[in-house]
Amino acid sequence: MTWTHLPLGNKTSRFTQSALALMIAGTLPAYAGTFNPRFLEDVPGIDQHVDLSMYESNKAEHLPGKYRVSVVVNEKKMESRTLEFKAATEAQRAKMGESLVPCLSRVQLEDMGVRIDSFPALKMAPPEACVAFDDIIPQAASHFDFADQTLIMSFPQAAMKQTARGTVPESQWDEGVNALLVDYNFSGSNASYDAHDSETSYNSDSYYLNLRSGMNLGAWRLRNYSTWTRNDGNNTWDNIGTSLSRAIVPLKSQLTLGDTSTAGDIFDSVQMRGVQLTSDEEMLPDSQRGFAPVIRGIAKSNAEVTVEQNNYVIYRTFVQPGAFEINDLYPTSNSGDLTVTIKESDGSEQKFVQPFSSVALLQREGHLKYSLFAGEYRAGNYNSAEPKFGQLDAMYGLPYGFTVYGGAIFSDDYYSLAGGLGKNFGYIGAISIDVTQAKSKLANEENSEGQSYRFLYSKSFNSGTDFRLLGYKYSTSGYYTFQEATDVRSDADSSYSQYHKRSQIQGNVTQQLGAWGSVYFNVTQQDYWNDEGKQRSLNAGYNGRIGRVNYSVAYTWTKSPEWDESDRLLSFSMSIPLGRVWSNYHLTTDQHGRTNQQLGVSGTALEDHNLNYSVQEGYGSNGVGNSGSVNLDYQGGVGSASLGYNYNRDGQQVNYGLRGGVIAHSEGITLSQPLGESMAIISAPGARGAHVINNGGVEVDWMGNAVVPYLTPYRETEVSLRSDSLNNQVDLDTASVNVVPTRGAIVRARFDTRVGYRVLMNLTQANGKAVPFGATATLLDTTKESSSIVGEDGQLYISGMPEKGALQVNWGKDQAQQCRVAFTLPEQQDNTGVVMANAVCR
């Protein structure tokens, strides 16, 4: 046997081109009908007695057996599966014109959406037995497109389950693999400050670590949420909570044990430790689903923005001058308002409170949403009593667009009952009104009783206006929420009673202006019974575009009871594209007339555009002077990293961060980008370096694994590898896999890889003639699957070949139309090309 190494970059002979063309053609759909062998009479090297019947795409006869097929049911594509096909009966041939029909069991038909209970013959059949579906179900039919390997099933609508648009069958939901995981987010900053107009100077170091660790075991999810902060040498470690949860699929609910928070639809949400059973609307299709808030603000300089909830820092980021938006808060809970702090580069701070509210309470007709809680109250990161309590919430959709809802909270020193009604008035919008009656025992055994009234409204207009009055709420002086009553009872001398809420209003308006952009207006106000001041904030802005130039104008106004004056900021921003680079300009001015201007460039780099960079230079009035910054953010396959430097007249700061995840599973330890809630582990043995589509920087590691983060639970997601990124010794049977993770699942996306040499053989028979065109060659190896078709002049291109083995070659059913090739590849071959060989088939 003679071997030659053929580099892919060199010109190939016509024989090589023919074989490679045959390989490529084999991957394309075939549309030919019956093939006439007479066309091959004058082609040298082709046996006129070769049996081509198996390649005739529309021939009436195909061999029964198991085929891997794509399944389409009533024009809806389902997942691919391996099915057994049997020869059609005469009646089936006459009815459907098919030579092969699928052998489908009762279970498989149910997975396809057939209403089994409507057909007694199906209901009585053994679960895995092949049934005559076309006889049992009137007008049912199948068509096997052999060329495309696609099974097309057709059933009358009356025989199908009535499923909503977007439904993913529960049989496809994947609880995932057992694994340990850690999702981390570390940030740090080192600053030096030396004021020119005073003798003040200092250095400041700050570090923050956010850890979400856990374990998946079957359907159970164990999670812990902890944070660590270090400010100027002072360390703080907070164990925010640990929980154990799982899906209860028959109830479309989620069971949680441990640290969690109550629902915030009817009562104010509070942190708790105990047992929770709540409806999980993610299990419903998109068309049947009924909010973490978006935080907007303006930074005067390169600033650090932190978000606190219940005195815990739950989010921290660094922003550039101008208007910013935070829309990726991790949904830890909906308990408590959010305190946002903007720390400017000169050390000054802005603070405002972002209320955490919901829209009008509505449910679809016949749909019940409920929550059950039992446990003890947790105050968060401050001292308070922790009484035991129970809570029940329920909302039910009635006919004619009505929704009725209510709930109750019971504790030794507190009880509350709530009831309300919501209505979708169509063009007018959605409105809900409710009242809550509460009785509280405060400090010194003092009893207090009162009511709270709430009005919620939301409406989107065809003109592009989205108007939401996310609440007007008024409470009498005797009304206390469960959290207020508990905190006041814990310490009557504290400032808790100062923030006894009286009324709250929040409104959001967004107007789309088509080609002219959009405007938004957000306003909140909250006042208290024991304080004359009011917490107020206003955000307004306009986003527009002229040609390829983007620009925006934003205004913020905030006022707190403890402040002598309000904070007011006005900003203007503009971005101009310069190829792959953007030129940016930002202008901000405050209530004292102090302005800050920034001019710079930003863009992306690298093949996957996963390196973001920006360079800014600025100047501030009123003695602020020059400032500038450089920022880099890299999103790699095993994590993300950021690095920034900024300076002004009074000091300089370096900030940096690392974000990512680690998963330990049965096939190795895999590093990842930040994980999110649900994710997939790609398993592609031997495909090291292969890139994952639509996930910048993610590629398969040396163990054949990669993590695709941030999957949507209970939704089908396509996970794909870039075929052009595979090395020359790896081939894929399919470049994409569909997965449907449950909440918190780590699902396996397994790719069937063929790892080995790519070989081009010139095959001759023992009599010296070339092996006939159209013969099939199959690798005889129990651990590998590889096959191909012989081209003209006996040329065979086949991939995934081991260094040593044998091929079985067939071009007919007779013994004389079969032979075997034993081969041994050279011990050393690089992986940049195709190995050529001359071999005798015996």
Would you name each region that the model predicts?
Residues T2-S13, A19-R289, Q591-I663:
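Post-signal-peptide, soluble extracytosolic/periplasmic N-terminal scaffold domains
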Residues L63-A88, G686-G696, N767-T782:
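Short, ordered, surface-exposed loop/turn motifs in non-cytosolic proteins
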Residues V71, G297, A680-A684, Y757-Q765:
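A short, amphipathic beta-strand motif
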Residues T82-L83, E90, G697-N705, T783-Q795:
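Short, acidic Ser/Thr/Gly-rich low-complexity loop/linker segments typical of extracellular
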Residues K95-L104, L329-S335, N705-D731, E792-Q815:
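Short Pro-Gly-centered beta-turn/loop motif in secreted/extracellular proteins
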Residues L104, Q172-D232, L368-K439, G603-L611, ...:
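Conserved, compact domain cores that house catalytic/ligand-binding motifs in diverse enzymes
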Residues A159, G188-S192, A219, W228-D232, ...:
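Transmembrane beta-strands of outer-membrane beta-barrel pores
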Residues W173, D205-G218, D238-L251, E386-Y400, ...:
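Feature captures outer-membrane beta-barrel proteins of Gram-negative bacteria and organelles
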